[in-house]
């Protein structure tokens, strides 16, 4: 958490916590505490809420995802939150299909190997099919529906769905069209 505060403080440009969430809602180490979010927001940056059930906590589904958006937007403003998926769509038969492809060389360590042994990510309950599918990219239009249902304006929805990250990218990389 302190590294996030330090990075935002010393940066001359806005920073992004791209694949995160609100620590107040889940307590996962990948999520940012309010002090970190404040440092990022004060610098003009944004926090990207990820689509990983174990990081989101709560119901671990699209509602938990929207809860993180609500928390950050309510506490820090709609300019402070964006989508930071941290995952691609994985079809239900992915593992079966991957077994058909011969392995070449040594396997790399999966990112989960870097987390503490008691990390929620390792708990099988977060691999529930309902949770996974509700956060699948095929359901991303439902993020918009959910934000409409929760009372966000069209302008705020556009910011959250990509406007905020584009704003930061344009400020950080002004010479790129």
State each model region's role.
Residues 1-2, 20-23, 52-54, 86-90:
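Active-site beta-loop-alpha junctions enriched in small/polar residues
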Residues 1-16, 29-45, 63-79:
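Histidine/acidic residue-rich metal-binding segments in metalloenzymes
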Residues 8-18, 65-74, 100-110, 144, ...:
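Short, electropositive alpha-helical surface patch
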Residues 19, 40, 47, 86, ...:
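Conserved, mostly hydrophobic/aromatic
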Residues 22-31, 55-63:
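Acidic-and-aromatic substrate-binding clefts and catalytic sites of carbohydrate-active enzymes
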Residues 51, 76-100, 106-133:
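Short acidic/histidine-rich active-site segments
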Residues 61, 92-98, 169-177:
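Short glycine/threonine-rich loop-to-helix capping motif typified by GTGT followed
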Residues 124-177:
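Mid-to-C-terminal alpha-helical segments outside catalytic/metal-binding sites
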């Amino acid at each position: 958490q302190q590294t996030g505060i330090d990075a935002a403080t010393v940066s001359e440009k806005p920073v992004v916590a791209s694949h995160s969430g609100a620590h107040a809602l889940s307590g996962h180490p990948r999520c940012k505490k309010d002090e970190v979010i404040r440092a990022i927001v004060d610098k003009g940056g944004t926090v990207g809420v990820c689509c990983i059930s174990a990081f989101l906590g709560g119901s671990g589904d699209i509602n938990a995802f929207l809860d993180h958006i609500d928390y950050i937007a309510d506490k820090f403003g709609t300019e402070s939150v964006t989508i930071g998926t941290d995952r691609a769509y994985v079809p239900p038969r992915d593992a079966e299909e991957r077994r058909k492809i011969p392995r070449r060389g040594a396997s790399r360590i999966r990112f989960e190997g870097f987390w503490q042994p008691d990390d929620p990510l390792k708990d099988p309950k977060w691999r529930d099919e309902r949770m996974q599918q509700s956060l699948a990219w095929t359901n991303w239009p439902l993020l918009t529906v959910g934000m409409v249902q929760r009372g966000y304006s069209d302008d705020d929805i556009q910011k959250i769905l990509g406007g905020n990250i584009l704003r930061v990218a344009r400020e950080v990389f002004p010479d790129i069209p």
